């Protein structure tokens, strides 16, 4: 060993003795409390104590007295700065030994077992606390240091210390080596930003030096539009491409929302079907979109393209759709529908929802490129509508090859199967319930119609258990007029109209409950146009009766509650209950009124209804004559497509043969004559209900 090394060893022994002398003084400062936390602290928090128990955690643990010479040689040769321990100047001067931060470790690692081992920071702090050791530290900068925590060294010594302690900076993510502060500010703080908590693929091996690279992790996680991104354009793999910025320039992606998406989802659960006809049929639900993210000043064309959704041919079997072969890809025809308002500015398209309610689907191959822009489809094929937004150049020419100007949006819930008649009854019912025009059931209930073409809107309730829902009660504005106070006494007869009939078993005009519908044979209800009632008022002046115009409202509303009271009771019961029904003036009056008034046999005008029966008798007769009517009589009524309630009255007044030729014979030819008496009317009434 060189002589300089022996001098260094002697000096180290002397330094250790000085530490033992000042141990009691340091314990008064509370250093013993800091000693207790030593085993759990990394190198950045080594306490400044002289307790020998902390020596096991010192970086000089691997050096012993028996090998102090070898270790000193090893450490001297490995030092980057090359300790010249053979110099007499360095043997007597501590300034040279501690002139560099790293040299203090080489001396502390050769201590004997009976001497306390500690980090260089302990000696540095000891010099500050005890003035007697001041000759050992000639560097003023180190003497002025009063921090109780060890400041990270610079250069190669930091890497060696980090390796010996098992990379503790993975627990305490301090700043890179260029920082010298204990709590550096900025992105490399002790508490890193949220991005470093969730790196894309876990923490990388260089945790401490490379920690700042995670400061911007998940930089798009809080960006607007990415948490709940809309459907991206077709052909793009990221939702960010659909994020539009209003007022952006070229290449900015638009953002499209399906306005009636909940309605589409209802149909999509049962596999949506769309009717195609030769003349063209509009879609329901129709396509309606909201568009954002367009350039307000640029011009765009917006159009819908219908393409095959899959290469299969479909059929409805066993209550579900199944594939049966390959689709015909050679189908020629128009597949594009351009919105009528195209081209237009981005501000126009973003102002309100874009509806394609006039888009029509057809199976007519000859309807190519016509003015109606009908889309030609094949039956029993599944199709997918796609929305295209194409930016138009200044000269009005579209550049379909420029992907930055051509954007396509696809919504899977818009898929549908083209059919010529609805296959799934659930889809039919959804169309009826939600389509205000109720056109869906026309193609599905053709086999149920038994009447003429004018009566095609009246399917038989016996054939269709859902026919009572064909016209929802909330669809007509006349519903508020028919409250319980008006219809509770209304017999379940018909409302007549020469135009259209609507089946109602428990719908708008029916006073029956659901239980009664199940027990009473079905019958038809007629909705009378308002215009017809207005014309009826003009005809009332020619008759002998003294009616007021207020008594002739639509559907005979005034007469319904008046039936409950009859102060003039000199008319026999049979006169009111008979099918002629309107007293001695019945023949003349009925011949004039039957062609214009839609009254049923129970909806008498007020002039006669007040003179006929007491209230209790009216209720009794109505319950006996209408609720307990034999099925044959009501089947006669249900088979009639426009005659009046009294079959005998219809036969007497109709110049042609009635449609109820198959009905039971009714002996009522004499009813309604001028000289027919009240008793005869009663016999006619009872014979009418007993003949069945």
Swiss-Prot record:
- InterPro entries from the UniProt entry: p53-like_TF_DNA-bd_sf, T-box_assoc, T-box_DNA-bd, T-box_sf, TF_T-box, TF_T-box_CS
- Spell out the Pfam families in the cross-references: T-box, T-box_assoc
Q: Which SUPFAM superfamilies match?
A: p53-like transcription factors
Q: Which residues bind DNA?
A: 263-443
Sorted alphabetically, the Gene Ontology BP terms of this entry are:
CD8-positive, alpha-beta T cell differentiation involved in immune response; endoderm formation; endodermal cell fate specification; mesoderm formation; positive regulation of DNA-templated transcription; regulation of transcription by RNA polymerase II
The UniProt entry's GO CC annotations, sorted and at most eight, read: chromatin; nucleus
Segments carrying the region annotation (Required for transcription activation) are 578-692
Q: What is this protein called?
A: Eomesodermin
User: Gene of origin?
Assistant: eomes
